[in-house]
Amino acid sequence: MNLRIFLVVASLVLSVLLGLVLGQRGGGAPQAAAGDARVVIGLSLDTLEEARWRADRDIFVARANGLGAEVVVLAANGDDTTQVGDVEKLLTRGIDVLVIVPHDGKAMAKAVRMAHDAGVPVIAYDRIVRDSPLDLYVSFDNVRVGELQARYLVDHLPTPGRGRIVRIYGARSDNNAALFKAGQDRVLAPYLERGDITVVHEDWAEEWKPENAKRIVNAAITASGPRFDAVLASNDGTAGGAVQALLEEGLAGRVLVTGQDAETVALQRIAAGTQAMTIYKPLGSLARGAAELAVKLARRSVVVAPRAVDNGATAVPSVLFDVVTVTRDNLLDTVVADGFATYDDVYRGIPEAARPPRPGT
């Protein structure tokens, strides 16, 4: 029996109805009938060690449960072999749709093929799976994230548009790291070509680990001394490692540091002045939206996918959510107003007299 999943890929002028056929080739998992049977979603996560992913999981599960679906969650602790094994377990369990946050976007192509062999559609969550016949990609506009990081840095150098910087990329295995870099490159290119901005040191922070980011900043200081104006860090974890290195050199608060994810510790650094900005990615919208889309795919309903992203094998129907730049000036109007973080959490460690008025007072 063939299983047909319909996705509407919309543009400014037209909508195209795509019928993506997943052949159930032997031993397929039982599929949810449209609108009646209870949907079972398999959620395969790279890791739950970071607070960000625990938040995604909780919001996703709550929304899916609210729609009458069951979610089976497995986390691979950053190991590709474990994650492939997790997918095998989920397929054996009899899931109707697989949602995967890949540790390695290329390695998990095998997991997509396994799911399709079992007649199960696959959604890549936040990180795309490369070189695979992926059914749907749900994420943020990650090139835009990099553009916003670099634009803020350029505009807020001591002399706007001129300076010496350190660049910290993310994990090479994470396709998002390449997208963030592409967005940064797009903004920085003319300044680098003119020689207005100089990159004194750059490297990849493998596994996104703060300690690797700290080593990159330490290497920059060893190579060129503390003569740089900013650190273009690609997320809040690497920003934290950069800030630690700067603290040890007495440079924290004097060197601009970027970030991403609006982690609580990063918001606290922004309030304290040791990190300049972060990118707020409304996880609630992403996780709830992905849960809704997963249920629709499991029930063979029409899904509207306004974008398409090339994963090396196909143009994957994609739903990309927008992001917001957060600085000390708009903490209250963004993450606090949205309920993403509390006033007390953000300003913990800041003397009462130095805090802005509490909302509602």
Feature locations, PLM:
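A residue-level marker of the well-folded mature domains of exported/periplasmic proteins
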Residues: 2-361
